[in-house]
């Protein structure tokens, strides 16, 4: 039985699309007799015409990916976009290298493990990029007999 007109009117009343209007198949005769918006409203109140739930977008896949990223996954070369300097800027990389070096030098100077002159020399070397890491600097100091144990 064709109730497309009633569905169209119901869609206007319910403020939704025609596809979201559900008509009870057992009461098609009643629906067929409805020709005004008021008739349709009565059928809606009786539960013969119902507005279907809107279909959403599942966020399950998104949550799964977020969980993996939180664990540090999905960071391989195939996932990387942009240049090396775009992912971690050169300045940030430099700051992450120089700050621990300067902190180490300061601690050694305050605890009098190194002399002021060698502190200044090492400070300038660090600024020049001579050391990759704290361990590299310590190795240099041991090899050159700067570090007083």
UniProtKB/Swiss-Prot annotation:
* Signal peptide bounds: none
The record's Gene Ontology biological-process terms are: translation
Is the keyword rRNA-binding in the record?
A: yes
Coiled-coil blocks: none
Tree of life domain: Archaea
Q: Where is the composition biased (Basic and acidic residues)?
A: 55-69
- InterPro entries from the UniProt entry: 60S_ribosomal_eL19_sf, Ribosomal_eL19, Ribosomal_eL19_arc, Ribosomal_eL19_CS, Ribosomal_eL19_dom, Ribosomal_eL19_dom1, Ribosomal_eL19_dom2, Ribosomal_eL19_dom3
- Ranges of compositional bias, category Basic residues: 70-88
Q: Where is this region: Disordered?
A: 55-93
Q: Which UniProt keywords apply?
A: Ribonucleoprotein, Ribosomal protein, RNA-binding, rRNA-binding
What Gene Ontology terms describe what this protein does at the molecular function level? large ribosomal subunit rRNA binding; structural constituent of ribosome
GO CC terms for this protein? Answer: cytosolic large ribosomal subunit
User: Quaternary form?
Assistant: Part of the 50S ribosomal subunit.
Function of the protein: Binds to the 23S rRNA.
Identify its protein family: Belongs to the eukaryotic ribosomal protein eL19 family.
| The name this protein goes by in its record | Large ribosomal subunit protein eL19
Originating species: Methanococcus vannielii
Q: Which gene encodes it?
A: rpl19e
């Amino acid at each position: 039985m064709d109730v497309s007109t009633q569905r169209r009117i119901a869609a206007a009343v319910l403020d939704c699309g025609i596809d979201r209007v559900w008509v009870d198949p057992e009461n098609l005769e009643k629906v067929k007799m409805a020709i005004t918006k008021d008739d349709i409203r009565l059928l809606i109140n009786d539960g013969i015409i119902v507005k279907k739930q809107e279909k959403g977008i599942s966020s399950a896949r998104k949550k799964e990916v977020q969980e993996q990223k939180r664990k540090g996954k999905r960071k391989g070369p195939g996932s990387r976009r942009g240049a090396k300097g775009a992912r971690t800027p050169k300045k940030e990389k430099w700051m992450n290298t120089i700050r621990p070096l300067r902190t180490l030098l300061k601690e050694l100077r305050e605890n009098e493990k190194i002399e002021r002159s060698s502190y200044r020399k090492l400070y300038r070397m660090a600024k020049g990029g001579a050391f990759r890491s704290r361990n590299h600097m310590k190795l240099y100091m041991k090899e050159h007999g700067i570090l007083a144990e």
